[in-house]
């Protein structure tokens, strides 16, 4: 199936010169969504990945992470922006091109012996994925790899990530 044909391009969003890759058109296509999750599942199995948890990055990582967790018989854990989780959290601050940001995960969500797979809809510069891996490694989790629907090749995000399996389905 040609997944790229199910992604809508929105020029000049969120600002001039940017082409936004809109996944909502993939999400509302039943066969495309099923194919996406089935393909992610198959690729994870091909790599021999057997995570205890899928860690979904806010917020579109949740959309693909939950069904992938179900398929892999794993739990699901959200990583969120500050102030979005109600209980005690672990956090990590990371640098952006112009400033910094931080991510949080519930303290009781994972433990040092857990194996995790990080999932998001898209990898661009890799900063958020790298920070998520850093947060999980700080806790003592074993990061097994990463899974993304879309990779923006020219932004070089893959090179910033640890030498682990990186699954992508669509390249731009």
Curated annotation (Swiss-Prot):
Recorded hits in PANTHER family, A to Z, give:
ADENINE PHOSPHORIBOSYLTRANSFERASE (PTHR32315:SF3)
- Which NCBIfam families does the record cross-reference, listed alphabetically? apt, PRK02304.1-3, PRK02304.1-5
Tell me how this protein assembles: Homodimer.
Q: Which Pfam families match?
A: Pribosyltran
Query: According to its UniProt record, where is this protein located?
Result: Cytoplasm
Gene Ontology MF term list: adenine binding; adenine phosphoribosyltransferase activity; AMP binding
Per UniProt, the keywords (alphabetical) are: Cytoplasm, Glycosyltransferase, Purine salvage, Transferase
**Its domain of life?**
Bacteria
- GO CC field: cytoplasm
Quick one: signal sequence residues? none
Q: Which organism is it from?
A: Microcystis aeruginosa (strain NIES-843 / IAM M-2473)
Stored InterPro entries: Ade_phspho_trans, PRibTrfase_dom, PRTase-like, UPRTase/APRTase
The record lists the catalysed reaction(s) as: AMP + diphosphate = 5-phospho-alpha-D-ribose 1-diphosphate + adenine
Would the keyword Cytoplasm be found if you checked this record's keyword annotation? yes
Q: What is its main location?
A: cytoplasm
One record GO biological process: purine ribonucleoside salvage
The UniProt function text for this chain reads:
Catalyzes a salvage reaction resulting in the formation of AMP, that is energically less costly than de novo synthesis.
Q: What is this protein called?
A: Adenine phosphoribosyltransferase
> Pathway listed for it?
Purine metabolism; AMP biosynthesis via salvage pathway; AMP from adenine: step 1/1
Its family? Belongs to the purine/pyrimidine phosphoribosyltransferase family.
Write down the EC number.
2.4.2.7
């Amino acid at each position: 199936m040609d997944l790229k044909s199910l992604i809508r391009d929105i020029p000049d969003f969120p600002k001039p010169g940017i082409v936004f890759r809109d996944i909502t058109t993939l999400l509302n296509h039943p066969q495309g969504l099923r194919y996406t999750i089935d393909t992610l599942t198959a690729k994870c199995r091909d790599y021999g990945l057997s995570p205890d948890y899928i860690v979904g990055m806010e917020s579109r990582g949740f959309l693909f992470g939950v069904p992938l967790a179900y398929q892999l018989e794993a739990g699901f854990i959200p990583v969120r922006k500050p102030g979005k989780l109600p209980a005690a959290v672990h956090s990590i601050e990371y640098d952006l091109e112009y400033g910094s940001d931080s991510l949080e995960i519930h303290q009781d969500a994972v433990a040092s012996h857990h194996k995790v797979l990080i999932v998001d809809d898209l990898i661009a510069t890799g900063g958020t994925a790298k920070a998520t891996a850093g947060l999980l490694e700080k806790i003592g989790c074993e990061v097994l790899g990463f899974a993304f629907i879309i990779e923006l090749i020219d932004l070089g995000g893959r090179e910033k990530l640890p030498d682990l399996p990186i699954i992508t389905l669509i390249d731009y």
